[in-house]
Amino acid sequence: MCTAMRRTTFTRTFVGGTLSLLAWLLTSVSCHAQDWGGSIAAVSDYVTRGLSQTRGDPSLQAGVHRTFPHGWSLGAGAATVDLGDWIDANYELNLNVARTWTLGERWSAQLSYTRYIYPDERGDHDYGELAGSLSYHDLLTATIAYFRHVSVYSRGTTAWSAEAFAIELSALQPVSERWSLLGGMGYYELPDPFRKGYLFWSLGLAFSWNALQLDLLRIDTDRTARQLFGTDRAGSRWSAALMWKF
């Protein structure tokens, strides 16, 4: 039996994590087994869990995915990043495996694992993300994500190869054939020795025309994130993305 599903693309500008993010630029995946798809995008500011991965600069991103019977899918992606001199990484790669279940006519669930790789980094910044999500009509999605071997650097505090988690709530509301409203918020519990976390949220518009999609988002974080990471990575910012889906 065919399992209908919708996938997030590799770009993660919206609320972040594995959603993310544009983390809520959704591509429809047909029910035919072993389908290929993908996207190429230019993003004005690459943001994950409220933090800029390019320090406010643009990012080029690309991703491909393949769906299989019974709700399985595989994906891979790449993006340009600027994580600062202490990491010195210019590229981010990811590999993803996911399983999606339909739960009646209204609900669906997904479990995924993503490995993030920084091939030219200083040190070992690679990490894994295990995420589970529950969606209602593909309009409202709740996600919890667990991060293993993640490293976080801030002003005066460093977590090296530690564990962290995030929770996110995302909404997608079509208002016409081409326009949709996007919104979301989440909480990221930072790894030890931070002993704290921060809130992040976003609101925006998406316009789609054939294989093209244009998004404009307003993203913000709470004061804790701004104090830890500075305004070049955290705080209020605009992010726009132009994507071609194939």
Segments predicted by a language model, with ranges:
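Repeated loop/turn-to-beta-strand initiation elements of outer-membrane beta-barrel proteins
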Residues: 36-38, 70-76, 105-111, 138-144, ...
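Residue-level signature of outer-membrane beta-barrel architecture
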Residues: 44, 66-68, 99-101, 107, ...
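Short glycine/proline- and aromatic-enriched beta-strand/turn motifs that initiate or cap beta-hairpins
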Residues: 33-84
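Cleavable N-terminal export/targeting peptides
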Residues: 1-35
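Detector for outer-membrane/organellar transmembrane beta-barrel domains
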Residues: 125-190
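Residues that define the transmembrane beta-barrel architecture of outer-membrane proteins
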Residues: 56-60, 89-93, 107, 124-128, ...
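Outer-membrane beta-barrel "beta-signal"
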Residues: 173, 203-212, 218, 232-246
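Transmembrane beta-strands of outer-membrane beta-barrel pores
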Residues: 42-48, 78-82, 115-119, 136-138, ...
